[in-house]
C-alpha cells in the first residue's frame, strides 16, 4: 500500500492520516480466488466476468486486512453477485459459516432472496420480514435453531428489532444502497455501529452525492478506528480546497483506494451496447406562461425579504416545476366538462413534445421507460396513453410486492410499449432491459436518482443500444436545475474516477436561500417576452439519430439542432454542457424582467385596493389575469339565460359524473384483469363466494321469503351450547362461520386456535388469500375443513367473513355491519345450494359496545327467516354454564322478537 500523506510532516497530520500510515505498514498477503474455486465451494448459475472476479478478490483482500470497505461499482455491474461470491469464499475457503447480515430496501428484498437461491443454493438464507407477530415467530425459530448462513432484512425492520439483531455476532454486515448511511448522526448509522460485526461491506452505485461530510460518514462506518466521527471537520478542512491544490487531490485519491472500489460500464463492460444521451428543449403553451407568471407573483415576500425562509422559496420552485410539466396539475385549470381530448396535449409544451416523440418511437418499434417525479403527473400521462391507445404498465411508490413483480414480468414477456415509473420508486432493484429508450419527463434534483433510473435499461443483459432522452423546459427553472445537477454529478466522476476534484466547502444556509431566490428568476426575460405559445415542431430523426428495426444505430452522433443537444464525446454521465458558461445565476435581463413584473403587480394591487374591490392579505397576492377579470362589472343575466346556464351546468355535471363512472369501471376492469393474470401466474384459485346479485336465486322473491318466515319451527334461530368448530349437525353439510379482518394475519387464541386445532386449512387459506389480495370487506372464503377429522355423514365447511379492517398502524376496527350483511347474503346462497345448515359463534360478544341485537336481526333476516337451519353457539366455560344453557335452550326462540 502506498503511504498517504508522506509529504506532510507528522506533526501537521490529522489523526486519520497518522492512523492510516500506521496501519499500512502491516498488510496481509493478497487473496487469490479463481472461478473454479468458487464453483467447487458452491457457486452456481452464473459465469463471473473478469472485473467481477477481480472485485471478489478485492473484497477477500479487504476482509483479511481491514474492518470494512465500499464496493461502489456503477449500477448494473453486479454488486449483488460479487457479494454472494464473497460469502461463498468465506464459507468454502475459510470455513466461516457466518452469520452474514444483509440490509436492503424493501423493493429489492425478493431480488436478493432469488439471487441467493440461484448463485449460492448451499448457503441457507432466512428472510426476516413481515408483521410484528410473524417476526416474533421467526425470532423464536432463530433462537431455537440459530444455524443459518445469511439473514436478509430491511433497514426499517432492522431499526424496529435492533435489540434482537444485536444479539448475533455477525461475521459480515452488508448494507445495500448504502447512501442511507451518508449522515453519521442518523439513527441507522448509530444503530448499526453498535452491532457486533467483524467486517462491514457497503454497496452503493452512488458513493459520493453531495459533500465531503457524506464521504467521511461512509468511511467512518467501515473503518471507525481510522476515521473517528470527531475528525470529520479535520477531513473537510484538509480537502475543501482540492480544486486548487493538486497535492491534496492526489492525497485524497490515494486515501480512498484501499477502501473504495469503483468501476463504470464504459471501462469494464465494453461488450455492453452503447448508451447515448440527448436533451430536447421545449417551449411553453400560453396557458403555462400565464400560470408561471402568476406563481412568481403569488408570494412576493419570499423574494423581497432578505430573511425569507427557504421553505417558501422551495414551494415556489415546486409550483413552477409543476407548471412546466402540465398546468392541469393545478386544481380548477382543466376546462369543464372534464372530457379527455387534444386539449390535454396542447395545454402543455412538454406533453406536446412527448406526443410527437412517442409517435416516432412507436412507429420505429422501440420500447420506452417513461419517468416522472410526480405521481399526479403519472396520472395525466396514464390518461394520455389511454387516449392514444398505447399499451403500458405502471409502477410508483403505491405499488407493492407481487403487483410490482407482475408488472415487471408483463413488460419483459409481452410487447408492451411503455412502462410508466416514478423516478424514486422505479430507480432501484428493477431489471427492465426489454426497453431500449429511457425518457425523463422531468428531472430529479439529485442526478444520481436519474442515473439509477436509467440503469434499469442500460445494464448487463441489455443487447440493444440505449437512448436516454431528457425533456427540459427552455428558459424555465427546469433548465437551471438541470445545469446545477451537472456540477453536482461531477463529484462521483472526479473524486472517485479521476483524482481531480470540484468539491469545496459548503456555503452558508443564508447564501443558499439567496441563490434559490435568484434561480427562480432564471429565463424570465425570454420566457415572458411574449404571452403566446413558444411550442414548435422539431425534426426528431435528426435529433435522435438513425433507427432500424427497433434498434438505435449508434455509429455516429447526429448534428444537434435548435431544441436539442447531444452529449459531448467522452462524457460518461447523464448531464452535459452546451459550450456555454453554466453559471447558477440569472442574467441581468432576467432580473430586470422580474422587477418589472413586481412593479406591475404592486401597481395593480394599489389600484384595486383604492377602488375597494380587493382585501389585501399580507404575503398573499392574487393570480394575474384573474384580478383583471374581477374588476370588470358583470352583465346581469335574464331569467331565460339563467335557466339556460343552469341546464348547461346540470348537463355538464351529469356528463362529468358519467365519464368519471366510466373511468372508474374501466379502471376496476383493468385492475381485475391484472389481478386475474397475477393469480394465474401463481396458480391461485379463489375460494371467495359470489355476490347475491351475480347468482340468481331461481325465482325466489320477497313473497316466498315471507311465506317461509311464517313457519316458526323452520325459521327460528336455534341457540345451543357447545363448540362451534364441531357443529351439531345431522346428515347435511354444515357451514361454520367466523369473522376475520382484511390483513391476512391469522389470529391467536379463542376461535382462531380452536379452528387451527380442528384443521390446517383455515390459516393456510386465509393467509394465502391475504398474500394474493383476495380479502375485501364483505367477502367470504368458503372451503372444507375435514382434513384432520370428519363426520360419518355430511361435510364441514368454514366460511370466513371479512368484516373488520386493520390499518397500517395495526389498529383494528369493529365489526362493520354493512360488510357482515353483505357476507350473510352470500352465505345464504351457498347454504341453500348445498342444503346445508349454518353454525355461528356469538359474533362480537367480547367487543365492548357491540350491537349484538342488530347482528342477531341480520342473521335472522338473511339466514333463518329464509329457511336455512341456523345455530348460534354459546361456548360453555363451566359446568354451571352448561346446565344453565341447557335449561334455557328450549325457550331460546323467544329471546329476539
Curated annotation (Swiss-Prot):
Location of this chain's protein in the cell: Nucleus; Chromosome
Activity control note: Adopts an inactive conformation in absence of DNA damage. Binding to poly-ADP-ribosylated histones activates the ATP-dependent chromatin remodeler activity.
All residue ranges annotated as the Helicase ATP-binding domain in the record: 60-225
Required for ATPase activity: annotated span: 617-675
Coiled-coil region: 640-677
Biased composition (Basic and acidic residues): 562-577, 650-672
GO molecular function per UniProt: ATP binding; ATP hydrolysis activity; ATP-dependent chromatin remodeler activity; DNA helicase activity; histone reader activity; nucleosome binding; nucleotide binding; poly-ADP-D-ribose modification-dependent protein binding
Keywords from the UniProt entry: ATP-binding, Chromosome, Coiled coil, DNA damage, DNA repair, Hydrolase, Nucleotide-binding, Nucleus, Phosphoprotein
Segments of this protein annotated with the region Disordered: 558-577, 611-673, 689-713
UniProt motif DEAH box: location: 176-179
EC identifiers of the protein: 3.6.4.-
Binding site for ATP: 73-80
One GO cellular component, as annotated: site of double-strand break
Major location category of this protein: nucleus
Alphabetized PROSITE patterns for the sequence: DEAH_ATP_HELICASE, HELICASE_ATP_BIND_1, HELICASE_CTER, MACRO
Domain Helicase C-terminal stretches: 353-515
Keyword ATP-binding: yes
Composition skew (Acidic residues), residue ranges: 692-713
GO term, biological process aspect, one: chromatin remodeling
Region (Regulatory linker segment (RLS)): 603-637
One Pfam family named in its UniProt record: SNF2-rel_dom
Residue stretches making up the Macro domain: 704-897
Function: ATP-dependent chromatin remodeler that mediates chromatin-remodeling following DNA damage. Recruited to DNA damage sites through interaction with poly-ADP-ribose: specifically recognizes and binds histones that are poly-ADP-ribosylated on serine residues in response to DNA damage. Poly-ADP-ribose-binding activates the ATP-dependent chromatin remodeler activity, thereby regulating chromatin during DNA repair. Catalyzes nucleosome sliding away from DNA breaks in an ATP-dependent manner. Chromatin remodeling activity promotes PARP2 removal from chromatin.
Free-text comment on this protein's domains from its UniProt entry: The macro domain mediates non-covalent poly(ADP-ribose)-binding and recruitment to DNA damage sites. Mediates auto-inhibition of ATPase activity by interacting with the N-terminal ATPase module, encompassing the helicase ATP-binding domain and helicase C-terminal domain. Binding to poly-ADP-ribosylated histones upon DNA damage releases the auto-inhibition by the macro domain and trigger ATPase activity. Does not bind monomeric ADP-ribose and mono-ADP-ribose fails to release the auto-inhibition of the ATPase module by the macro domain.
Family, per entry: Belongs to the SNF2/RAD54 helicase family.
Name the UniProt record assigns to this protein: Chromodomain-helicase-DNA-binding protein 1-like
Encoding gene, per UniProt annotation: CHD1L
Amino acid at each position: 500500500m502506498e503511504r498517504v500523506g508522506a509529504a506532510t510532516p507528522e506533526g501537521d497530520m490529522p489523526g486519520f492520516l497518522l492512523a492510516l500510515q500506521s496501519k499500512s505498514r502491516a498488510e496481509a498477503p493478497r487473496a487469490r480466488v479463481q472461478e473454479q474455486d468458487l464453483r467447487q465451494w458452491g457457486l452456481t448459475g452464473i459465469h463471473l466476468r473478469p472485473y467481477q472476479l477481480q472485485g471478489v478478490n478485492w473484497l477477500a483482500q479487504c476482509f483479511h486486512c481491514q474492518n470494512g470497505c465500499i464496493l461502489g461499482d456503477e449500477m448494473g455491474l453486479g454488486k449483488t453477485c460479487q457479494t454472494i461470491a464473497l460469502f461463498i469464499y468465506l464459507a468454502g475457503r475459510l470455513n466461516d459459516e457466518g452469520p452474514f447480515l444483509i440490509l436492503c430496501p424493501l423493493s429489492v428484498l425478493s431480488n436478493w432472496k432469488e439471487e441467493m437461491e440461484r448463485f449460492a443454493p448451499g448457503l441457507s438464507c432466512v428472510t426476516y420480514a413481515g408483521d410484528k407477530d410473524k417476526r416474533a415467530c421467526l425470532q423464536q425459530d432463530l433462537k431455537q435453531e440459530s444455524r443459518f448462513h445469511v439473514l436478509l432484512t430491511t433497514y426499517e425492520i432492522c431499526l424496529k428489532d435492533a435489540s434482537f439483531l444485536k444479539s448475533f455476532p455477525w461475521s459480515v454486515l452488508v448494507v445495500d444502497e448504502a447512501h442511507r448511511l451518508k449522515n453519521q448522526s442518523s439513527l441507522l448509522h448509530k444503530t448499526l455501529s453498535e452491532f457486533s460485526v467483524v467486517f462491514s461491506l457497503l454497496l452503493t452505485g452512488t458513493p459520493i452525492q453531495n459533500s465531503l461530510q457524506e464521504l467521511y460518514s461512509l468511511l467512518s462506518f467501515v473503518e471507525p478506528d481510522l476515521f473517528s466521527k470527531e475528525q470529520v471537520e479535520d477531513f473537510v478542512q484538509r480537502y475543501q480546497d482540492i480544486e486548487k491544490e493538486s497535492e491534496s487531490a492526489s492525497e485524497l485519491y490515494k486515501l480512498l483506494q484501499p477502501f473504495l472500489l469503483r468501476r463504470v460500464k464504459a471501462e469494464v463492460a465494453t461488450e455492453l451496447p452503447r448508451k447515448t444521451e440527448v436533451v430536447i428543449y421545449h417551449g411553453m403553451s400560453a396557458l403555462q406562461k400565464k400560470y408561471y407568471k402568476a406563481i412568481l407573483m403569488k408570494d412576493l415576500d419570499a423574494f423581497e425579504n432578505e430573511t425569507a425562509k427557504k421553505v417558501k422559496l422551495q414551494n415556489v420552485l415546486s409550483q413552477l416545476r409543476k407548471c412546466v410539466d402540465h398546468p392541469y396539475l393545478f386544481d380548477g385549470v382543466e376546462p369543464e366538462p372534464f372530457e379527455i381530448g387534444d386539449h390535454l396535449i396542447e395545454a402543455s409544451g412538454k406533453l406536446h413534445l412527448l406526443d410527437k416523440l412517442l409517435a416516432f418511437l412507436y412507429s420505429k418499434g422501440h420500447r420506452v421507460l417513461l419517468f416522472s417525479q410526480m405521481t399526479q403527473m403519472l396520472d395525466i400521462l396514464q390518461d394520455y396513453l389511454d387516449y392514444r391507445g398505447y399499451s403500458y404498465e405502471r409502477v410508483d411508490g403505491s405499488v407493492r410486492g407481487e403487483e410490482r413483480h407482475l408488472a415487471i414480468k408483463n413488460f419483459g414477456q409481452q410487447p408492451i410499449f411503455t412502462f410508466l415509473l416514478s423516478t424514486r420508486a422505479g430507480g432501484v432493484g428493477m431489471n427492465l432491459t426489454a426497453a431500449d429508450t429511457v425518457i425523463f419527463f422531468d428531472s430529479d434534483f439529485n442526478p444520481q436518482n436519474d442515473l439509477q433510473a436509467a440503469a434499469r435499461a442500460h445494464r448487463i443483459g441489455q443487447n440493444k443500444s440505449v437512448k436516454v432522452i431528457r425533456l427540459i423546459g427552455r428558459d424555465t427553472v427546469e433548465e437551471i436545475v438541470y445545469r446545477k445537477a451537472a456540477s453536482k454529478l461531477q463529484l462521483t466522476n472526479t473524486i472517485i474516477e479521476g483524482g481531480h476534484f470540484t468539491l469545496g466547502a459548503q456555503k452558508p444556509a443564508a447564501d443558499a436561500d439567496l441563490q434559490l431566490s435568484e434561480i427562480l428568476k432564471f429565463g424570465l426575460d425570454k420566457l415572458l417576452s411574449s404571452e403566446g405559445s413558444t411550442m414548435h415542431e422539431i425534426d426528431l430523426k435528426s435529433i435522435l439519430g438513425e433507427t432500424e428495426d427497433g434498434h438505435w444505430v449508434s455509429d455516429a452522433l447526429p448534428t444537434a439542432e435548435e431544441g436539442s443537444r447531444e452529449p459531448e464525446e467522452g462524457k460518461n454521465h447523464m448531464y452535459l454542457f452546451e459550450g456555454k458558461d453554466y453559471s447558477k445565476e440569472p442574467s441581468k435581463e432576467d432580473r430586470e424582467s422580474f422587477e418589472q413584473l413586481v412593479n406591475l403587480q404592486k401597481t395593480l394591487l394599489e389600484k384595486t385596493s383604492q377602488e375597494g374591490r380587493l382585501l389585501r392579505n399580507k404575503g398573499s397576492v392574487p393570480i394575474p389575469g384573474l384580478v383583471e377579470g374581477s374588476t370588470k362589472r358583470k352583465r346581469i343575466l335574464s331569467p331565460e339565460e339563467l335557466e339556460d346556464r343552469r341546464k348547461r351546468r346540470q348537463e355538464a355535471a351529469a356528463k362529468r359524473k358519467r365519464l368519471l363512472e366510466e373511468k372508474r369501471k374501466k379502471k376496476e376492469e383493468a385492475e381485475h384483469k391484472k389481478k386475474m393474470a397475477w393469480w394465474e401466474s401463481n396458480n391461485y384459485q379463489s375460494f371467495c363466494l359470489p355476490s347475491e346479485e351475480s347468482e340468481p336465486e331461481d325465482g325466489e322473491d320477497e313473497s316466498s321469503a315471507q311465506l317461509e318466515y311464517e313457519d316458526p319451527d323452520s325459521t327460528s334461530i336455534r341457540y345451543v351450547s357447545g363448540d362451534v368448530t364441531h357443529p351439531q349437525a345431522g346428515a347435511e353439510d354444515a357451514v361454520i362461520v367466523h369473522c376475520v379482518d382484511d390483513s391476512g394475519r391469522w389470529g391467536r387464541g379463542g376461535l382462531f386456535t380452536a379452528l387451527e386445532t380442528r384443521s390446517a386449512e383455515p390459516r393456510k387459506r386465509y393467509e394465502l388469500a391475504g398474500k394474493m389480495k383476495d380479502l375485501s370487506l364483505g367477502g367470504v372464503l368458503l372451503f372444507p375443513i375435514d382434513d384432520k377429522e370428519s363426520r360419518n355423514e355430511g361435510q364441514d365447511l368454514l366460511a370466513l367473513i371479512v368484516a373488520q379492517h386493520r390499518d397500517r398502524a395495526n389498529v383494528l376496527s369493529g365489526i362493520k355491519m354493512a360488510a357482515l350483511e353483505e357476507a350473510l347474503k352470500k352465505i345464504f346462497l351457498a347454504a341453500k345450494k348445498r342444503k346445508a345448515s349454518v353454525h355461528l359463534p356469538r359474533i362480537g360478544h367480547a367487543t365492548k359496545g357491540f350491537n349484538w341485537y342488530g347482528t342477531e336481526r341480520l342473521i335472522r333476516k338473511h339466514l333463518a327467516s329464509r329457511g336455512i337451519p341456523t345455530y348460534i353457539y354459546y361456548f360453555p366455560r363451566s359446568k354451571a354454564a352448561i346446565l344453565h344453557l341447557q335449561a334455557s335452550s328450549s325457550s331460546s326462540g323467544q329471546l329476539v322478537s
